[in-house]
Amino acid sequence: MKSSIEPDFWKHKTLLEMTDAEWEALCDGCGKCCYRKFIEGHGKRKKLYYTRIACNLLDLETGRCTNYAKRFQLETDCTKLTKKNLPDFHWLPPTCAYRLLNENKPLFDWHPLISGDPHSVKKANILIKQGIHEKDVIDWFEFVVDGH
């Protein structure tokens, strides 16, 4: 049986041309999209803040969802990133494969599709350190990582 993922597919296919399996394979498993963000201000003064506050389903050690199949039922504000709504997600981290390819940029060497190592994200220190689950947080401002 032929694999549904072609070698180096991201180099010659647009995001819209990718199969569902190829689309899913783009995720490096950093988990950063599962960390809470908030926006402060309006217009030119609007600023996006990233936090160390994770969705309650995120495994903080692996950066993977603990219930990926049912994530939308269990976490009503879970973000569904699709080929059609990708342009709306300008807040994705600059290391995100979806964002990189949408901006016509190459993947980083540590990306599992390049390295061949599913643990390369952790080895490259891309995972957020000292994450905390949302259910354990009282004051979000204590957990701001940076703002853009």
UniProtKB/Swiss-Prot annotation:
InterPro entries linked to this entry: Puta_zinc/iron-chelating_dom, UCP006173
Pfam families to which the protein is assigned, alphabetical: CxxCxxCC
Family classification: Belongs to the UPF0260 family.
PANTHER family: UPF0260 PROTEIN YCGN
Entry protein name: UPF0260 protein PM0539
Species the sequence originates in: Pasteurella multocida (strain Pm70)
Lineage: Bacteria, Pseudomonadati, Pseudomonadota, Gammaproteobacteria, Pasteurellales
